[in-house]
Amino acid sequence: MKNNADYIEMKVPAQPEYVGIIRLTLSGVASRMGYTYDEIEDLKIAVSEACTNAVQHAYKEDKNGEVSIRFGVFEDRLEVIVADEGDSFDFDQKQQDLGPYTPSHTVDQLSEGGLGLYLMETLMDEVRVQNHSGVTVAMTKYLNGERVDHDTTIKNYETN
């Protein structure tokens, strides 16, 4: 298997109105890779949560903060890294405060402030968090579902 990848990097102001731009870019990349509609929606939710956390918690009132997003496009997976240089938090402690989760728990039983991390871990195949000099969230979604054929044309439909 090849380890070749294409990388797409974005740096946006840490403001809520820019999260939509990240979602649109992600949707385009994931669609081009062949993810299903449901997988793309899962990706958008998880990445939006990571970006929203950076916007809301990293810089507090500082309007000059930035969020960096990197998409690693591999043959078998999409890796998304969301990073900020703002305030860090203790991920292990936060996870301990939140969990454990069981299927019998309903969403309204989850601890306040931890739903984003829970969603990221539930919707993505891998999630890693580093909290040195800001917070970096690395998420991976493997491509294993049906691929969307992007070479489909009207002519292809007419011949079938």
Swiss-Prot record:
InterPro entries: Anti-sigma-factor_SerPK (IPR050267), HATPase_C_sf (IPR036890), RsbW (IPR010193)
UniProt superkingdom: Bacteria
Induction notes from the record: By heat shock, salt stress, oxidative stress, glucose limitation and oxygen limitation.
GO molecular function: ATP binding; protein serine kinase activity; protein serine/threonine kinase activity; sigma factor antagonist activity
Catalytic activity: L-seryl-[protein] + ATP = O-phospho-L-seryl-[protein] + ADP + H(+); L-threonyl-[protein] + ATP = O-phospho-L-threonyl-[protein] + ADP + H(+)
Record entry for activity regulation: The higher affinity of RsbW for RsbV than for sigma-B, rather than a difference in the concentrations of RsbV and sigma-B, is the driving force that is responsible for the switch of RsbW to non-phosphorylated RsbV. The kinase activity of RsbW is directly regulated by changes in the ATP/ADP ratio.
Root EC class: transferase
Annotated keywords: ATP-binding, Kinase, Nucleotide-binding, Serine/threonine-protein kinase, Stress response, Transferase
Stored Pfam families: HATPase_c_2 (PF13581)
A single BP term in Gene Ontology: negative regulation of DNA-templated transcription
EC number: 2.7.11.1
Record-linked Gene3D superfamilies: Histidine kinase-like ATPase, C-terminal domain
Homology family: Belongs to the anti-sigma-factor family.
Assembly and interaction partners: Homodimer. In stressed cells, forms a complex with RsbV. The predominant form of this complex has a stoichiometry of 2:2 (one dimer of RsbW is bound by two monomers of RsbV). In unstressed cells, forms a 2:1 complex with sigma-B.
PANTHER family: ANTI-SIGMA-F FACTOR RSBW-RELATED, SERINE-PROTEIN KINASE RSBW
Function noted in UniProt: Negative regulator of sigma-B activity. Phosphorylates and inactivates its specific antagonist protein, RsbV. Upon phosphorylation of RsbV, RsbW is released and binds to sigma-B, thereby blocking its ability to form an RNA polymerase holoenzyme (E-sigma-B).
Protein known as: Serine-protein kinase RsbW
Organism: Bacillus subtilis (strain 168)
Gene that specifies this protein: rsbW
